[in-house]
From Swiss-Prot:
It catalyses: a D-aminoacyl-tRNA + H2O = a tRNA + a D-alpha-amino acid + H(+); glycyl-tRNA(Ala) + H2O = tRNA(Ala) + glycine + H(+); D-tyrosyl-tRNA(Tyr) + H2O = D-tyrosine + tRNA(Tyr). This is D-aminoacyl-tRNA deacylase. Binds 2 Zn(2+) ions per subunit. D-aminoacyl-tRNA deacylase with broad substrate specificity. By recycling D-aminoacyl-tRNA to D-amino acids and free tRNA molecules, this enzyme counteracts the toxicity associated with the formation of D-aminoacyl-tRNA entities in vivo. Catalyzes the hydrolysis of D-tyrosyl-tRNA(Tyr). The gene is dtdA.
Amino acid sequence: MDIKLVYSTLDPVGVTIKKLGYRFEEINEDVTDFHYENGEAIVIFSRHESKAGIPSLTVHYPGNPSEEIMGGEPKKLGIAYPRLLTSILREIKKIDLNIEKTMEATHHGPTYQNVPVIFVEVGSNETYWTNDTIVKALVDSTIRSIDKVDEIDCEYYISGFGGPHYSRLFTKLADESCIGHVISKHYIDKLDDKVIIQTITNSVNTINKVVIDSLNSKQKERIIASLKKLNNINIEFR
């Protein structure tokens, strides 16, 4: 598969990558609203921001689960590629740096692409975005992960609902299974049937399991009602 590695010249992590001498695809757009669509899959490196400023390496898919948008379109998810994201996450976990490595729930744009997009990010402030050692370790691990996409084991292909934005559960499940879209608890009450279905259908690999994390009975019932429209989906509650 033709997987394109991309950075933006408007992003500080992209600037660091360019300074380090990597020759990837270069865009001059906001990473949350870019229109680049070459190749069969896109991995875009970018900064991750958080008020806590905790150093972190994160991966996630783009998508806006509700009417609220940050780039892209409302109520539209990008295309997931569970094998690729999981391969990247597993390699990131091997990086020998005292830094948090985690999967984030699906959020922000872009949502225009007809190919999968995966964000690989450095957090959480300029100290880390411009740190050559951290950025190089992340980029090199991502390059290694691409060579392993077709080799990794996936017990299940999982989509998820619930839990916090930084998901320890799905980060852990990625040790054995491959992870698609994860919708955090913050969006659950804003979901409509269309978005719930997209968590299953918008995926390169066929999703065969849904994990529901710490939701109340009313929220579970609504998700299950939507999922019943699809066949052969195993549902697990945590």
